[in-house]
Amino acid sequence: MKNVLALSLLLFSLSAAAQCDSVSEINVQIVELAKKKLGKKVDRGECWDLAKYVLDETGANWDGFLKFGMALKKGECVMPGDIIQFDKLKTVMVVNGLKTSESFPQHTAIVYEVKNADELVLIHQNTGYTGKKVGTSTFKFSTITTGKYTIYRPIAH
């Protein structure tokens, strides 16, 4: 039991990110563009399509593939408009006594809101919640059991 608790605390400390004191202009624009698409399908409805749309519309500097800007280091502050790329990530949580799990084999999402160091609200599409349409969902770093993620800070041209 002590080992499980120690591992959980280690995962949380490596995963949690601080909230930034301010939000960059390009990130504000990204959130506003994504918000206007709530309930709508962007392009093919793939998760990546929403990120591509907001980055292209803002004229952001990115590689057109999976490098959505500058990769943040663990522990750096996260702001709305940052883009998170999940890779083979799994989460497990207990809600009202029920154990639920979620898998993100390869998924792209935009940070919509930073609740605290552990909890984000994501805006994304191609999910189990909203299908191919843009919607929001909560993500907690403390629920990660396996896999990895990278958070990118969009860069203005």
Describe the residue ranges of each PLM region.
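Compositionally biased, intrinsically disordered low-complexity regions
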Residues: 8, 61, 66, 71, ...
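...with weaker cross-activation on analogous glycine-rich loops/strands in unrelated enzymes
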Residues: 60-128
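Aromatic- and glycine-rich peptidoglycan recognition patches
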Residues: 21, 25, 102-157
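Hydrophobic alpha-helical elements and their junctions with loops/disorder across both membrane
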Residues: 13-15, 41, 116
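N-terminal capping segments
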Residues: 19-70, 89, 99-104
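Bacterial Sec-dependent N-terminal signal peptides
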Residues: 1-21
